[in-house]
C-alpha cells in the first residue's frame, strides 16, 4: 500500500491549522514570540506582510529592549522602526547606539514610555542635558540609570535628576568627569535615602567631602565604586564605615590616599574590598620574587 502524498507548495491538508491562524494575543505573542531572540524576529518579519504585522504587534508590547540583542551596531533608522510603537517599556538599554544616539532620537522614546524603571545610556556621548531632563521629568518611576562615560553630564544635569527621580536606587556615573563634590553632595542630600548602588569611578574631581556626605545620607547604600578617585582619602572611608551599616562592596583601587587603617573596620564586617591588605600583598610579592611558594602560607 502506497503512503499518502504530502501536500506541496501552498497546498494544505484539510483541517490543518497554519501558524498564523493561531490566536495572536493569546498564544503567539505570549508563548512563542516572547521566546524568540530579537534578532531572529527581525528576520521573521521579512517573510510576509502577515509576519511583519505580527512582529510589529510584539514590538509594540515590549517591556524590555536591549539594543545589544540586535547586534553590536544598530542603524538609526532600524532603532526608530523597532521602537516606533512601543509604549510600555520598563527597561531600555542603548549602549550599542552610542556613536550616533542624539536627543532627537531618544526624547520621543522617553515620552512614549513613562513607565521606564531602568535605562542604560553608557557611552552615549552625543546626548545632552535635554535628554536627561526629559528622562527625569517624564519617567518618575526610574530606579536604575547608567550614564557611564557620558562626558556631557554636569552638575546642573545631575541636580535635575536628583530633584525629579524619587525612586532612584542605582546610578552609574563612571567617568562623568565634569561632576564635582558639590553635585554629589546635592545628590546625596536629595536622593541619598533610597540609593543602594553608586559608581563615581574615574573622576579625579570627587573627594572626601562628597564621600562623607554620601555616607551620612545613604543608610541603605550597598555598593560604592570610587576606583580612580584620586582625591578620596581615609577620612571618607572612615565615615562610610561609621554611617553605612549595610555596605557590601567598596571599590577603592588607585585611591592612593586611602590607608589600610581606614579599611580594616570594613573588612572586619565582611565588606568586599578590591584592594588586598598590605601583608597579603607583601607575601604575594615575596612569593613572586624569591620563589618561596612551597614555604609561604598566604592565609592572613
UniProtKB/Swiss-Prot annotation:
Subcellular location, principal: cytoplasm
Ranges annotated as spanning the membrane: none
PTM-bearing positions, type N-acetylmethionine: 1
UniProt domain F-box: residue ranges: 19-66
Region described as Interaction with SMURF1: 113-269
Subunit structure: Part of the SCF (SKP1-CUL1-F-box) E3 ubiquitin-protein ligase complex SCF(FBXL15) composed of CUL1, SKP1, RBX1 and FBXL15.
Function: Substrate recognition component of a SCF (SKP1-CUL1-F-box protein) E3 ubiquitin-protein ligase complex which mediates the ubiquitination and subsequent proteasomal degradation of SMURF1, thereby acting as a positive regulator of the BMP signaling pathway. Required for dorsal/ventral pattern formation and bone mass maintenance. Also mediates ubiquitination of SMURF2 and WWP2.
Name by which UniProt lists this protein: F-box/LRR-repeat protein 15
Lineage of producing organism: Eukaryota, Metazoa, Chordata, Craniata, Vertebrata
Encoding gene per record: FBXL15
Amino acid at each position: 500500500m502506497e503512503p499518502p502524498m504530502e501536500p506541496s507548495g501552498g497546498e494544505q491538508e484539510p483541517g490543518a491549522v497554519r501558524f498564523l491562524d493561531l490566536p495572536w494575543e493569546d498564544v503567539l505573542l505570549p508563548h512563542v514570540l516572547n521566546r524568540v531572540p530579537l534578532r531572529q524576529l527581525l528576520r521573521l518579519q521579512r517573510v510576509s506582510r502577515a509576519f511583519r504585522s505580527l512582529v510589529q504587534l510584539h514590538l509594540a508590547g515590549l517591556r524590555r529592549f536591549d539594543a545589544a540583542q540586535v547586534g553590536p551596531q544598530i542603524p538609526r533608522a532600524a532603532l526608530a522602526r523597532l521602537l516606533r510603537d512601543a509604549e510600555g517599556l520598563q527597561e531600555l538599554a542603548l549602549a550599542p547606539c552610542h556613536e550616533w544616539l542624539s536627543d532627537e532620537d531618544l526624547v520621543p522614546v522617553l515620552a512614549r514610555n513613562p513607565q521606564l524603571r531602568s535605562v542604560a545610556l553608557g557611552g552615549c556621548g552625543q546626548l545632552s542635558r535635554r535628554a536627561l531632563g526629559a528622562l527625569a521629568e517624564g519617567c518618575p518611576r526610574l530606579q536604575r540609570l547608567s550614564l557611564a562615560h557620558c562626558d556631557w553630564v554636569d552638575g546642573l544635569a545631575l541636580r535635575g535628576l536628583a530633584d525629579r527621580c524619587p525612586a532612584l536606587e542605582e546610578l552609574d556615573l563612571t567617568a562623568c568627569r565634569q561632576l564635582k563634590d558639590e553635585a554629589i553632595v546635592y545628590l546625596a542630600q536629595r536622593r541619598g535615602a533610597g540609593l543602594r548602588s553608586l559608581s563615581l569611578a574615574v573622576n579625579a574631581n570627587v573627594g572626601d567631602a562628597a564621600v562623607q556626605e554620601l555616607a551620612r545620607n545613604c543608610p541603605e547604600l550597598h555598593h560604592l565604586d570610587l576606583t580612580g578617585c584620586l582625591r578620596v582619602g581615609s577620612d571618607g572611608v572612615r565615615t562610610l564605615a561609621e554611617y553605612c551599616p549595610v555596605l557590601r562592596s567598596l571599590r577603592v583601587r588607585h585611591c592612593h590616599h586611602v590607608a589600610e587603617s581606614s579599611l580594616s573596620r570594613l573588612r572586619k564586617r565582611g565588606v568586599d574590598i578590591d584592594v588586598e591588605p598590605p601583608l597579603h600583598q607583601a607575601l604575594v610579592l615575596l612569593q613572586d620574587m624569591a620563589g618561596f611558594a612551597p614555604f609561604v602560607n598566604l592565609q592572613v
